[in-house]
């Protein structure tokens, strides 16, 4: 696959996209578009929550908020 076709396939937007990242410790990080990332149920609200508004074609805006981390809860961590 050429570099141009790789970039073209990446730049196609999907409104219901969801990204997830698993670490070696078994905890996971899951984030959908315009959502708050959760670091897993074993470490609720540890560190800053990542508020992400992602537009793959244009840019990635990340803002870190320590205040949001204190009150942010993951949907799976009840």
Swiss-Prot record:
- Report the superkingdom from the record: Eukaryota
Pfam families attached to this UniProt entry: Coiled
Note down the stretches annotated as region Disordered. Answer: 1-31
Any GO BP: sorocarp development
Q: Which family does it belong to?
A: Belongs to the hssA/B family.
Q: Which PANTHER family match?
A: HSSA/B-LIKE PROTEIN 1-RELATED-RELATED, HSSA_B-LIKE PROTEIN 1-RELATED
Q: What is the name listed in the Swiss-Prot or TrEMBL entry for this protein?
A: HssA/B-like protein 29
**Species assigned in the record:** Dictyostelium discoideum
The beginning of the lineage is: Eukaryota, Amoebozoa, Evosea, Eumycetozoa, Dictyostelia
């Amino acid at each position: 696959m050429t570099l141009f076709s790789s970039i073209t396939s990446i730049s196609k937007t999907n409104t219901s996209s969801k990204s997830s990242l698993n670490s070696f410790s078994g905890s996971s990080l899951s984030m959908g578009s315009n959502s708050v990332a959760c670091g897993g149920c074993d470490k609720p609200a540890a560190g800053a929550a990542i508020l992400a508004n992602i537009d793959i074609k244009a840019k990635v805006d990340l803002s870190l908020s320590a205040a949001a981390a204190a009150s942010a809860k993951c949907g799976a961590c009840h």
